[in-house]
Amino acid sequence: MASVSKSSIPQKVQSALWARAAGRCQYRGCNTDLVGDLVAGRQDGIFGFIAHIVADVEGGPRGDPIRSTQLARSLENLMLMCARHHKLIDLDAVADHPESVLLTMKAEHEGRIAIVAGIDEDRASHVIRFGASICDNEALVSTQAIFSAMPPDRHPASGQRLDLEMVGCAFRDNEPAYWTVQRENLRRQFEAKVRGRVERQEIRHLSVFALAPQPLLIELGRLLCDIVPAVVHQRHREPASWRWASDGPPITFQVTEPDIGLSGSVALKLGVSATVTDARLQAVLGDEAAIWSLCADQPHNDVLRRADDQAAFRRELRRLYDRIKARHGEGTLLHVFPALPASLAVEVGRVWMPKSDLSLRLYDNNRSHGFIRTFDIP
């Protein structure tokens, strides 16, 4: 194992450091694997350097007249580095890397490795990634962002994702063909990549990461249903992350019912990420539309921060499906107008039960045309 230290670091200390670092550079944001090089054809090659936080000599980087000697062979004073970052902290940018900064980097890296290595097999989860173009923007979900959001509760069952997306679709979401093509692609990919493996018990848990127009997210939820336990992650805007946060107060959900005398189509307004007025629904369905609603008290586009709020939404929606059916009868078509965080749109489909709930007609909010009809479920 390579080391530029002037001290003779005992082999057992070197081995312990490599183990704690999992053979990766401990510089924040690097995480380069320092074992093996496929390009050079050396799978057993070791390319890491052991760096001192407090130099082993007084005149070295972050050196100290007393502590340098005391800490020269201490595991807590050593970091595993790639060549670039070892040179950076000891030669090129010493002033930018004081002892406190390096100690924090070391603690963060080793803490993360300890969490991941400590997760047992029962917490393995297969990752579903689904993205579809929203307006003119492709909704891509990066693998690194996905995998880093899962611990400590879950870890990826493998390094492979179950990708259900269709990137580069030539149709736009204001064209009827877009919804037909995207929905059929999603259904076929789900059948090929997910359902069969669930039935063979190869998949026992799913972690879902999805960004797409809301009707397609609802359709994904319908396909998922309750075939296997799943966690649906939410993409947060500030800070950008897929991890659940604990900041912010709980969301207060408000449920409203239509007047008894209304005789038009039955609608469900879901306003959590934005305010949706009844007038926008009436522009589509007419003034006699019977509008039910489940809305956040203070909707905005980054409102969903807590997993508990997602669970609360599921409970409220489940009760609302039942109440709407009881009021309007078995054969009613329910028109759904969503303005939701992505994960809640998926939950709209997961909560819906095909054998007992009303059929749904899904609408999408189009920037130029308002709410437009997309497709029906089932």
Swiss-Prot record:
Residues 1-185 are annotated as: HNH nuclease domain. Belongs to the Cap5 nuclease family. It comes from the Bacteria. InterPro entries: SAVED. One of its GO terms (molecular function) is exonuclease activity. This is CD-NTase-associated protein 5. Effector DNase of a CBASS antivirus system. CBASS (cyclic oligonucleotide-based antiphage signaling system) provides immunity against bacteriophage. The CD-NTase protein synthesizes cyclic nucleotides in response to infection; these serve as specific second messenger signals. The signals activate a diverse range of effectors, leading to bacterial cell death and thus abortive phage infection. A type II-short CBASS system. In the presence of its endogenous cyclic nucleotide (synthesized by cognate CD-NTase CdnG) is activated to degrade DNA, probably exonucleolytically. Activated by an AMP-containing cyclic nucleotide(s); however synthetic 3'3'-cGAMP, 3'3'-cAMP-UMP, and c-di-AMP as well as the major in vitro product of CdnG (3'3'-cGMP-UMP), do not activate BdCap5. It is an enzyme of class 3 (hydrolase). It comes from Bradyrhizobium diazoefficiens (strain JCM 10833 / BCRC 13528 / IAM 13628 / NBRC 14792 / USDA 110). Keywords: Antiviral defense, Exonuclease, Hydrolase, Nuclease, Nucleotide-binding. Its EC number is 3.1.-.-. Residues 186-378 are annotated as: C-terminal SAVED domain. One of its GO terms (biological process) is defense response to virus. DNase activity is activated upon ligand binding.
